[in-house]
Amino acid sequence: MVDSIKDRHTITSIEQDSLKSWLRLILLFTIGVVGTVGMWSVVVVMPAIETEFNIDRGKASLLYATTMVGFGLGNFLIGKVIDRFGLKIPIIFATIILVSSYLAAIISTEFWHLLILQIFMGTAAATFFGPAMADIGNFFEKRRGLAVAIIASANYVAGAFWPLLISSFLELNNWKEVYFIIAIICATIMFPISYFLKNNVANNISGNDIATKNTSLNNLSPSTLQILLILAGIGCCLAMAMPQVHIVALCVERGFGLGIGAQVLSVMLFSGM
């Protein structure tokens, strides 16, 4: 099975920077905006969860911490799976995990249930971030930087879009009903898109060519460059921990309301694009 998937003679090839490359980018961007909801929904529903389970902010914030644990593991583990099996199967699998996690959260009765489910949500969301960026980079040469940046921005678009939508849902529904709505939206959009995503390969690309181009970056080895990027990512997330995770709950506590908190979060992440 693996050999058949990786055999270039049985997989449709796509010319780099072609119309099909851009169509693939649009599909990956769309599924990224929808699929990374797992990173942002918990931020908006955190005040409601604090009330329902009678917990303080410190304990409630563990929900986002476990999400990031899953997100980190997912980028690595699912990236390895995509290297072996292609993009289509992992995306379908991640969609199933994401939808199932939201549905399972609806019937959760203990806080630790949600902690575990957030790990799965984070892992699923990771599929549409790092692995998607790595995939789309293979289908562009002249516009590779732009293509990767567009896929990377899907997470920020999700952060700008989903909090507003979820806060509007919460005005009329409790958080479990909102989670059910999210599950339906994800299933309705992501499964059809995953059907159109094929395990394509790009023409006119070789690993040696990419490696040669990358060595021009101040003579840094790939491992050194990766370590520096990891450290930069950690530094970025440390700085964003308070505004990204606690801003909605803070606005609720200060009397501004959930809607205002969601708007502040949305503006902040929209600026990140």
Locate predicted features.
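Extracytoplasmic gate region of multi-pass secondary transporters
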Residues: V42-I49, P222-M273
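Intracellular juxtamembrane helix-capping segments at the cytosolic ends
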Residues: T127-F140
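Helix-loop-helix hairpin linking two adjacent transmembrane segments in secondary transporters
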Residues: I150-V201
